[in-house]
Every structure is written in C-alpha cells, then in structure tokens.
C-alpha cells in the first residue's frame, strides 16, 4: 500500500535554518497544530539539506522504514541534481519558494524548494 503524501522542504544553498523552513511552511502550508513539527534531516553533497517533515496534515514519518525513506530521498536528490529548476513540475510559487509534487519509491513527496536570495560575496583582489 503506497504511503500518503509527505512534505519535504528542500533548502538549496547555505544560510537557511530549520526555523526559516518553519516560517515558510506556516505561510504556504499551515499546520493544524502550531509548532508540531518533527524532522528527519538528510544532508546532501550539493550544499543542500532535505528535511523530511512530519506535521499534523500527514501521517507519521517514523512509520516509513528508514531504508525506504533513504532510497526515496536519494531519488529526490538525484532528480534535483539533474533536472534544472525551470524544468521541475512546479505547481505553486511564492517568493523564493517553489512547490511541486513527485512520487518516488511509493512515497508522494510534496516538495517545497526554498531558494535563498542571499548573494555570496567573494574577496576581490585590488
């Protein structure tokens, strides 16, 4: 039996925290119970953090076997690494947040892609 949708905020780049994610989630997908968030965190090689989020609108993430979740998150990472953002099936945009849904390893991911608007500054030679 396939799992229900689970929400995955994906942070691209540095400079964001899980509190930023919670702020975004409150704006775009408010929980029915305030602050009832629980994460599985996966760090990727691409300067990206994937939070697999449990909130009251979705089933208990802990019931998904860790191995299945890991495979699905790897598949999600591969997709994000190989598909340009403009080619993702984005259904909703709000500021620097893009949202889309995709099914990987029997799990439907409701993905919030959070692209920070910071500019990285490098030292210049004078």
From Swiss-Prot:
Protein name listed in UniProt: Putative gene 48 protein
Identify the domain of life. Answer: Viruses
């Amino acid at each position: 039996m396939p799992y229900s949708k689970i929400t995955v905020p994906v942070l691209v780049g540095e400079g964001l925290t899980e509190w930023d994610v919670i702020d975004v989630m409150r704006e775009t997908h408010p929980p029915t119970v305030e602050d009832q968030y629980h994460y599985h965190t996966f760090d990727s090689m691409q300067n990206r953090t994937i939070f697999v989020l449990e909130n009251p609108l979705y089933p208990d993430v802990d019931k998904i076997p860790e191995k299945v979740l890991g495979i699905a998150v790897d598949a999600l990472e591969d997709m994000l690494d190989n598909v340009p953002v403009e080619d993702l099936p984005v259904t909703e945009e709000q500021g620097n947040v893009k949202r889309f849904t995709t099914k990987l390893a029997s799990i439907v991911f409701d993905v919030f892609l959070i692209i920070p608007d910071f500019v990285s500054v490098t030292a210049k030679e004078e």
